[in-house]
């Protein structure tokens, strides 16, 4: 069983990347795809990068029927708003290959790494989400499509 864990940010249909990706997909059973934010502008604020390639990669994987698990890190004050979660749900519903959706509660375990490298931690002061907010996100992101599989 071969699994790739990725956010897909490097995805492009340009060559030589795309033909190499197609070859790799022949040997890949499934992917775990991180979607950190459904809104492009908010994704840029959270990660410093656009989500356009990530969402296009998800569509490509759906087109080729490659099974995926969607993973969403729930970050208070960033991605933990019902509006964004509902938009993510609606996007997931457009995909035909989703086997599972996981809500990953944000944590601060890696904050020390930033400090050791002399960088400011961009999420300093943000606490992990409450149990209630995680349950809320799970409720919103449940989709009838993947629950039937």
What residue ranges belong to the model's regions?
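Conserved AdoMet/S-adenosylmethionine-binding subsite of the radical SAM
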Residues: 1-104, 109
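A structural motif corresponding to the C-terminal lobe/cap of the Radical SAM core domain
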Residues: 83, 90-93, 99, 115-139
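C-terminal accessory region of radical SAM enzymes
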Residues: 67, 132-149
């Amino acid at each position: 069983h071969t699994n790739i864990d990725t956010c897909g940010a490097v995805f492009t249909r340009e060559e030589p990347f795309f033909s190499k990706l197609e070859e790799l997909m022949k040997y890949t059973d499934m992917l775990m795809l991180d979607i950190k934010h459904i809104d492009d502008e908010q994704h840029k604020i959270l990660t410093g990068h656009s989500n356009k390639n990530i969402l296009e990669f998800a569509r490509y994987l759906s087109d080729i029927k490659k099974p995926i698990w969607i993973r969403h890190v729930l970050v208070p004050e960033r991605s933990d708003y019902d509006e964004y979660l509902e938009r993510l749900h609606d996007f997931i519903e457009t995909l035909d290959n989703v086997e599972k959706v996981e809500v990953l509660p944000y944590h601060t375990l890696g904050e020390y790494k930033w400090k050791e490298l002399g960088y400011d931690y961009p999420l300093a002061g943000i606490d992990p989400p409450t149990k209630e907010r995680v349950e809320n996100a799970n409720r919103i992101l449940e989709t009838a499509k993947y629950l039937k599989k």
